[in-house]
Amino acid sequence: MTEQFDTRRRLMAMFRNEMRMEKLENTIAKKSTKFHTNSAALMTTIDLQQRKFEKLNALITRRCEDINTRTAFTRAVREKLAEERQKNAEMQAQLEKANDERIEQMDCVRTLSDASNTFINPSALPARLKGVTVLREEGRWISLDYDGDDLKGLSTFWAQAHSGSASQKWQQLLSMDKAIMPTLNDKGNVNVSVSSIIEIDLTASPSHK
């Protein structure tokens, strides 16, 4: 009887142990399933975050490239503006100098006109020399219309109508008129002296006096 009781007790203990093992296995299985589920969700979240990070990093890279490009462009524009300002200042100085020379040249034209009785159209200079020369002793006037480069024809005309000194001064004046009108791209200096041209003998009596 005692032996049967012991056997029954051992069987009950084994049954309880088996039940505890099954319960423990179920608990472990549930925890394992939950762990794997959480791990999968975490991996998915990490993957999404990684993709977002890559997109954000690519966007930041593009923005940095854009900023660098704009910075370089802004620097280039500023350098170009500074260069253009310098060119404009140089051209303005050239224009002012040419204008001063032109005014002085026009004064010279008037002086030579009065001295030689030759009156020209300033707007035709320097391409052509157009106007009239008055021969008061002969009571007549002669029109002239010469190409600005025809120095031989001009020399012949002035030699016949006026003194050799006046002829040379008119040729110098015409050459100077071409010299003081450089193009805007010409960086050379114009070194023409107008005052030297009018050094003719104005004390001599012109033909109309």
From Swiss-Prot:
- An individual GO BP term: meiotic spindle organization
Q: Where in the cell is it found?
A: Nucleus; Chromosome, Centromere, Kinetochore
Spell out the coiled coil positions from the record: 74-107
- Taxonomically, which superkingdom? Eukaryota
Q: Which GO terms describe its cellular component?
A: Ndc80 complex; nucleus
The alphabetical list of record keywords is: Cell cycle, Cell division, Centromere, Chromosome, Coiled coil, Kinetochore, Meiosis, Mitosis, Nucleus
What biological function has been recorded for the protein in this entry? Acts as a component of the essential kinetochore-associated Ndc80 complex, which is required for chromosome segregation and spindle checkpoint activity during meiosis and mitosis. Required for kinetochore integrity and the organization of stable microtubule binding sites in the outer plate of the kinetochore. Participates in SAC signaling that responds specifically to disruptions in spindle microtubule dynamics. The NDC80 complex synergistically enhances the affinity of the SKA1 complex for microtubules and may allow the NDC80 complex to track depolymerizing microtubules.
Say which family it is in.
Belongs to the SPC25 family.
Q: How does it assemble?
A: Component of the Ndc80 complex, which is composed of Ndc80, Nuf2 and Spc25.
* Protein's name in the database: Kinetochore protein Spc25
Q: Which organism is it from?
A: Drosophila grimshawi (Hawaiian fruit fly)
